[in-house]
Regions:
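Core dinuclear metal-dependent hydrolase active-site scaffold
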Residues: 2-37, 81-162, 225-228
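Short, hydrophobic beta-strand segments that form beta-sheet elements in well-ordered domains
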Residues: 5-8, 22-26, 42-44, 64-73, ...
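Binuclear metal-ion centers of metallo-dependent hydrolases, dominated by the metallo-beta-lactamase
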Residues: 6-12, 79-93, 178-228
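Active-site metal-binding motif and surrounding structural segment of the metallo-beta-lactamase
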Residues: 29-75, 156-167
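Active-site environment of divalent metal-dependent phosphoester hydrolases
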Residues: 30-33, 48-52, 74-78, 89-91, ...
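Short amphipathic alpha-helical segments
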Residues: 36-37, 54-57, 81, 139-140, ...
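Short catalytic-loop micro-motif centered on adjacent basic/acidic residues
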Residues: 43, 98-100, 166-169, 194-196
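A short, acidic, amphipathic alpha-helical segment used as a generic capping/interface helix at domain edges
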Residues: 150-156, 175-184
């Protein structure tokens, strides 16, 4: 049986731990233990302060096999173990293959295919970063129509994809449009488990999401999170 342990850290930060590797996405703050007995892959979707903390480069101490997969808007010193990716790129690291999608805000979203020693099947993980359906009433009709098109176009890459674990924004600041991004995503992919993120500490929005009539077809696949 595949060992895959998903841990919510804070905001949009998650770790996904396998027997033979660990992935970390958009670490901002919170408790995390970096293992020394397996490779660690650290993903950063863009440079916004709530998705990127330079502390991640301090994890690179002796004995840790670590690689950084960074959006190319991040100003990081070049190093052999740092890979910068723009939107719509593909990167093959052997047992990990990464596709990037163009964000509707800054940077990229990540679609990661993983070959672990425990499973003949690839494991697929999607982390949206700030790729979301950002509908702001105050921005007006033209902006919001463009946002809708940009979001739906970006997700065409994911159409029908089987995804084991997805991390998708559910932002309470969007008011009644808070669920539009996750709803479109879930209706256009074959995702087994989706974790809400980017909630700014307002975790009760998840209860609203679970009661939202539109989420009925996939409600049992939504995994509620709480900051540790």
């Amino acid at each position: 049986r595949l060992h895959m342990n998903v841990t919510y850290i804070q905001h949009s930060g998650f770790s996904v731990d396998f027997a033979d590797m660990m992935l970390v996405f958009d670490y901002w703050m919170g408790e995390i233990t970096i293992p020394e007995d397996k490779p660690v892959y650290v993903f950063v979707s863009h440079a916004h302060h709530d998705h990127f903390n330079e502390e991640i480069f301090e994890w690179e101490r002796s004995g840790v096999d670590i690689r950084y997969i960074l959006s190319d808007d991040i100003n990081a010193d070049p190093a052999e173990n740092r890979i910068l990716l723009g939107p719509d790129e593909f990167c093959d690291l052997g047992n990990i293959k990464i596709k990037t999608l163009r964000s509707t805000d800054e940077g990229v979203a990540f679609f990661v295919s993983i070959q672990t020693s425990e499973s003949a099947q690839e494991v697929h993980i999607y982390h949206a970063g700030d790729l979301n359906w950002w509908h702001w009433e105050e921005e007006g009709t033209e902006y919001n129509q463009q946002m809708k098109e940009d979001y739906q176009n970006a997700l065409r890459l994911m159409e029908g994809e089987h995804v084991d674990v997805a991390f998708v924004p559910v932002d309470p600041r969007l008011e009644d449009a808070y669920y539009w991004g996750i709803d479109w995503y879930m209706r256009h992919t074959d995702t087994e488990r989706v974790y809400p993120m980017h909630m700014w500490g307002q975790y009760e929005i998840q209860d609203r999401l679970l009661c939202q009539p539109e989420t009925a077809p996939y409600r049992e696949r939504i995994v509620k999170v709480m900051a540790s």
